[in-house]
Amino acid sequence: MKAKSYKLKYVPTVQQLRDAGFRPGGSWMHENAFMFAERRFAYELSVSICFFPDLGVWDDFYNILVLDEEFGQPYTPFYSENYKKDIKGFPVLEYCIRQYNDFLDSFDFLE
């Protein structure tokens, strides 16, 4: 199981973001966050994605946060030496990666 890399297929409009479930805010992810969407799932984890006011400025490291909700900090096993590497034998991390990929795959403006 490996976290995919994502980039913008096209720059979405504010209305397209709203239609995709984005809401204003997201400052816990980045001080310049303008709109965000998130998915919470088991094991007290969540995946959030944000856009800055310049919607074309986006990458899959600075604009996405996998958060350990219990401790209120980035989920370290996702980011540390495991970041975007093939993971086997760690069920919680594999589940997290699957949720990350499924959530980001749901947006038609990402590829």
What positions do the PLM features span?
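Amphipathic alpha-helical segments
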Residues: 3-26
